Amino acid sequence: MSDNDNAQNKFEEGMAEFVNKNYGPCIEHLSQAIVLDPGFSLAFKSRGAAFLRQDKPEQAIADFNMVIGMDSSNARAYHLRGLAYEKTGQNDKALDDFNRALELKTDYGAVYYSRASLNNKLGNTEQATEDIRMVTSLTEVNIETFGNANNVWRSQQLQLESVYNDDIAMER
């Protein structure tokens, strides 16, 4: 088995621990994945998220810096690093990261919510209100998109059932 395969296995073990909120073992597995594959950006991002859940924002920031160093267009890494900066009281850096994440992905509702929360905490109520409006708008769009996708699937399913029923009728 190659190092990449082993790294992937360790990553999957780590994510299973993350889902079960076992962040210590999660971090151990993800660290092993990173040793096996130092360019495994998703392992760094996931380990950073686990550090964030353990309230270790400095370690989280270090991992998110690695991800951003590997891929400066990773909106999620900027968002998560912004959350970590906010936990350390570095609110200007947090806002910068939230803004950068939104430059990269303008429909990233979670970032609008995070930025709204921080702006509200800082007394920037107009900006916070504007961001909450965006969260609401994006939520409505997502619900509509989901509904449309579900309707398309249902229409296709009904067409398949119709063809199947026609085939059965022809066989009789």
Residue ranges and their predicted role:
Residues 1-172:
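Alpha-helical tetratricopeptide repeat
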